[in-house]
Structure formats: C-alpha cells, structure tokens
C-alpha cells in the first residue's frame, strides 16, 4: 500500500508549513500542480531547495491531473509514495478529490495537508464578512467569439441574495488573466445580456500578488479598474453584494483615493 498526499503549499513561500515540507520529504514522487493556480514566488525549483534528498519532480499540467490521472494511480500501484503539491489549498477550487477517491478505492492510504488559500486570505484582507460570500466562479478567456456567461450569471445570482462573489481568473498556456481583462469580459457580457449585473460605477475589490511582499488590495470603481495598473499577476477580484454598514465603513481603508 502506498500513500497519496495532497499538499497545500499556501499562496507564497512564507506560508509553506513544516507539515507540508515533512510530507513532501517522505514522498518518492512530487507532482507540482502548475495548472490550477499560480503563486508570485513558488515554483518547482523552490520545492527542490526545500525538500532534501533524491526524488522525482514532475511539473503537471491539466492533461496529467485531469485527463491522464491513471498515470498517477499507476505510480501508487508500483509502490511509490506520491505527493501532489498545489498552490494554496489542495482541495479548494481544484478537482483533486477524484484522485483521492480512486486511490482509496484501490487500497492506498490518502493524506491531505491543508494550506492557506487565496480564497480565505482575500476574504480576510478585504475586510468583508466571511458569512456574506456566495458561490465563487472563474472568469475564462474567450474562445474565438464565445464568452462563457457563467461568471456573469453567478454574480447575478449572488447579488440577488445580497452576497459577494470571488472571481478567480483564468490561467491558459502559462498566461494569467489580469483583473483588467476579466472586467472587460464582464462588461462585454453586460452589454450582451443587459441585466444590470455590473456597471462602471460599481465598487469592486482587486487583489494582486497576495501573500508576497509587494501584494496589493484595492477597492475602486469598475471604470477605474479597467485601466488601472495592478502590477504583475496573479490577480483576483471580489464583486461585492449588499454591504453591511460595518463592511461599507471598513472598505474605506482599502479604497483608492
């Protein structure tokens, strides 16, 4: 019986836990998930320096983690202990639970090492109430002329219930979507559907390079945000719902002057 570990690395190097390093050190194969999310300063070379000793490192894209997961199960069946190391938390906004289920069905031991995710970090930094967040959603790059309306519809549903929406931004072929690009996509959807989900005068919150020394978190109007320089990626956005008076007061501390 082998061990499959899902290891959350946190959102930057300073949030990698001792438990994460210990688990990786006890693995024969470390699969670094570079598809699900990005960090401002964690990459496979950082893991090589943190984890001592000889072992195999694999940089995994979507094809391995979702479409060819049998290869990971095969490693376990051959007696190798395998860790999948993910930015943030290994099970928040990922599909890795399917691997745990399959490994368990085949008689292997499974472990989960939680990490600080951008989801909880952003909520804390935004000063908004954690109880008032609805479903999160990813804004994806357009495909030819097709723009996926899912984020627009999720924001609409959340706003109708007075809830805030966290928008994850797409990562495709090593290119991370910027907050500016995401907002332009949403405004195009607003032009098409005209359901008053997002207006240029709405206040939003944008986080950039969260967890790193140069992180930024700014509240500003959509019309300002579309051309604002948020710096290097990764970026993430909150579309607020109805603000409690304490939230409205607190948000002033991060409001762009």
Swiss-Prot record:
It catalyses: 2-[(3S)-amino-3-carboxypropyl]-L-histidyl-[translation elongation factor 2] + 3 S-adenosyl-L-methionine = diphthine-[translation elongation factor 2] + 3 S-adenosyl-L-homocysteine + 3 H(+). It comes from the Archaea. The keyword Transferase applies. One of its GO terms (molecular function) is diphthine synthase activity. Its EC number is 2.1.1.98. S-adenosyl-L-methionine binds at residues 11, 89, 92, 117-118, 169, 210, 235. CDD domains: DHP5_DphB. Pathway: Protein modification; peptidyl-diphthamide biosynthesis. Keywords: Methyltransferase, S-adenosyl-L-methionine, Transferase. One of its GO terms (biological process) is methylation. NCBIfam families: dph5 (TIGR00522). S-adenosyl-L-methionine-dependent methyltransferase that catalyzes the trimethylation of the amino group of the modified target histidine residue in translation elongation factor 2 (EF-2), to form an intermediate called diphthine. The three successive methylation reactions represent the second step of diphthamide biosynthesis. Homodimer. Belongs to the diphthine synthase family. This is Diphthine synthase. It comes from Saccharolobus solfataricus (strain ATCC 35092 / DSM 1617 / JCM 11322 / P2).
């Amino acid at each position: 019986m082998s061990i499959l570990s899902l290891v959350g690395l946190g959102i930057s190097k300073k949030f990698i836990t001792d438990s994460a390093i210990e688990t990786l050190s006890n693995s024969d194969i470390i699969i670094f998930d570079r598809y699900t999310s990005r960090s401002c300063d964690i990459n496979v070379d950082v893991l090589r320096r943190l984890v001592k000793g000889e072992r195999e490192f694999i940089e995994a894209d979507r094809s391995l983690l979702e479409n060819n997961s049998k290869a990971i199960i095969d490693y376990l069946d051959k007696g190798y202990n395998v860790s999948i190391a993910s930015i943030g938390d290994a099970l928040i906004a990922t599909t890795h639970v399917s691997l745990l289920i399959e490994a368990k069905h085949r008689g292997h031991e499974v472990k989960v090492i939680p990490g600080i995710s951008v989801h909880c970090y952003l909520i804390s930094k935004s000063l908004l109430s954690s109880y008032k967040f609805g479903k999160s959603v990813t804004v994806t790059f357009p495909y030819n002329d097709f723009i996926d309306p899912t984020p627009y519809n999720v924001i609409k549903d959340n706003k109708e219930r007075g809830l805030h929406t966290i928008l994850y931004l797409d990562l495709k072929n090593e290119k991370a979507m910027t907050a500016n690009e995401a907002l332009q996509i949403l405004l195009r959807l607003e032009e098409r559907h005209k359901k008053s989900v997002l207006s240029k005068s709405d206040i939003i919150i944008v986080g950039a390079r969260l967890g790193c020394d140069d992180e930024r978190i700014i509240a500003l109007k959509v019309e300002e945000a579309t051309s604002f320089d948020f710096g290097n990626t990764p970026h993430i956005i909150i579309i607020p719902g109805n603000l409690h008076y304490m939230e409205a007061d607190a948000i002033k501390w991060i409001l762009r002057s």
